[in-house]
Amino acid sequence: MTKEEAWRVLEECRRRIDELDLQLLETLNERTRVVEKIGQAKQVLKLPIYEPKREDQVYANVTGHNRGPLPAESLKRIFERIIDE
């Protein structure tokens, strides 16, 4: 790979990352809206907001569908942060 090709690859990859970041942002906001609806339903049903079993199901679901290259433990930490927010 020449330096010119490397610069082109770098710029293309950065543009793609920018696109993916916007998709992540949209998805995270949509997820938050759904979580808010769940919270409202749980209030009406007088259910606890925090359900450790459900959190474990989320982790199992995402790690079970992960085809890499992101390691399962990294993915779990990312989802822990998403859930905590």
Positions of predicted regions on the chain:
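Domain-level signature for soluble enzymes in the chorismate/prephenate branch of the shikimate pathway
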Residues: 1-85
